[in-house]
Swiss-Prot record:
Belongs to the reaction center PufL/M/PsbA/D family. One of its GO terms (cellular component) is plasma membrane-derived thylakoid membrane. Its main location: membrane. Tyr-161 forms a radical intermediate that is referred to as redox-active TyrZ, YZ or Y-Z. This is Photosystem II protein D1 1. It is an enzyme of class 1 (oxidoreductase). [CaMn4O5] cluster binds at residues 170, 189, 332-333, 342, 344. Keywords: Calcium, Chlorophyll, Chromophore, Electron transport, Herbicide resistance, Iron, Magnesium, Manganese, Membrane, Metal-binding, Oxidoreductase, Photosynthesis, Photosystem II, Thylakoid, Transmembrane, Transmembrane helix, Transport. Cyanobacteria usually contain more than 2 copies of the psbA gene. A quinone binds at residues 215, 264-265. InterPro entries: D1/D2, Photo_II_D1/D2_sf, Photo_RC_L/M, Photo_RC_L/M_CS, PSII_D1. It comes from Synechococcus elongatus (strain ATCC 33912 / PCC 7942 / FACHB-805) (Anacystis nidulans R2).
Length: 360
């Protein structure tokens, strides 16, 4: 009998850690990007939850009029938010150690910067982790490319827009009603509804929803029957099976006759590329629109642009939209200034389209 003695493998702790981090056998892949993603997202999540529940009011406008955003100060899930950092801080980096006290840091909205910076770093690492796992599994890198669309949108509203406007107080509040307030103010100050990049973004999001619903319903309607009438159709599919689970020829024929022949894809790969690319490109355009409007390259302005033969203004929808913008702008930061800039300078703008005659 021959005995073979193998030398015991002597990996140090660092080598075993590297192997664990990059192993695709783990239930959840960590990756080197995950080493940074996990602590940053945990920090952002914990700080957001604590601030949403218990943060004191924040002097967002920098005029010593704090705005309460937490649940303990009278808000509910809808109205609550982590209020952006003070206009007095501007674009300054404001970590805890830059404040004279913790109370001052809370009063000036320090938690907002802490959450946003850790969140942006964390989701960037998440995209890198997607690429890393795809690389290790020998897959193409398009998953992280698709994820870059919502990532760019987050960077646009939380970082690029405040930089362009000169203060993190102009960033999007971290709450439901705060998000809608941000949208209203953005429309009032930048006329985003009249910006072509926003229009492309709307087409991307709603078009993507439509295409997703159409694709899902077509596939579900053309499944290859593998079960009886009394069983769920889902039991007719076995994970990893080689056979097609639906009849793409039937789906192509149906949709081609419903619209016209060339509106229907006859190639499953090109179809799924289109389903992925359409919303991604649309959201990319929206992010670019936010980033350009951050520096006040605003949407189209057709106000008072249609005149009759005598030179009088024929009011269009653009003029109605302009009055709505002025109304929203007046309500925004009502105590920070007496009038919005475009109301305080220039000729007076009539509030009503026509003034009724009153006969007493």
């Amino acid at each position: 009998m021959t005995s073979i003695l193998r030398e015991q493998r002597r990996d140090n702790v660092w080598d075993r850690f590297c192997e664990w981090v990059t192993s695709t056998d783990n239930r959840i892949y960590v990756g080197w990007f995950g080493v940074l993603m996990i602590p940053t997202l945990l920090t952002a999540t914990i700080c957001f939850i604590v601030a949403f529940i218990a943060a004191p009011p924040v002097d967002i406008d920098g005029i010593r009029e704090p705005v309460a955003g937490s649940l303990m100060y009278g808000n509910n899930i809808i109205s609550g938010a982590v209020v952006p950092s003070s206009n007095a801080i501007g674009l300054h980096f404001y970590p805890i150690w830059e404040a004279a006290s913790l109370d001052e840091w809370l009063y000036n909205g320090g938690p907002y910067q802490l959450v946003v910076f850790h969140f942006l770093l964390g989701i960037s690492c998440y995209m890198g982790r997607q690429w890393e796992l795809s690389y290790r599994l020998g897959m193409r890198p398009w998953i992280c490319v698709a994820y870059s669309a919502p990532l760019s949108a987050a960077f646009a509203v939380f970082l690029i827009y405040p930089i362009g406007q000169g203060s993190f107080s102009d960033g999007m509040p971290l709450g439901i009603s705060g998000t809608f307030n941000f949208m209203f103010v953005f429309q009032a100050e930048h006329n985003i509804l009249m910006h072509p990049f926003h229009m492309l973004g709307v087409a991307g999001v709603f078009g993507g929803s439509l295409f997703s619903a159409m694709h899902g319903s077509l596939v579900t309607s053309s499944l290859v029957r593998e079960t009886t009438e009394t069983e769920s159709q889902n039991y007719g599919y076995k994970f990893g099976q080689e056979e097609e689970t639906y009849n793409i020829v039937a789906a192509h024929g149906y949709f081609g006759r419903l619209i016209f022949q060339y509106a229907s894809f006859n190639n499953s790969r090109s179809l799924h590329f289109f389903l992925g690319a359409w919303p991604v490109v649309g959201i990319w355009f929206t992010s670019m629109g936010i980033s350009t409007m951050a520096f006040n390259l605003n949407g189209f302005n057709f106000n008072q642009s249609v005149l009759d033969s005598q030179g009088k203004v024929i009011n269009t929808w653009a003029d109605v939209l302009n009055r709505a913008n002025l109304g929203m702008e007046v309500m925004h930061e009502r105590n920070a200034h007496n009038f919005p800039l475009d109301l305080a300078a220039g000729e007076a703008t009539p509030v009503a389209l026509t003034a009724p005659s009153i006969h007493g």
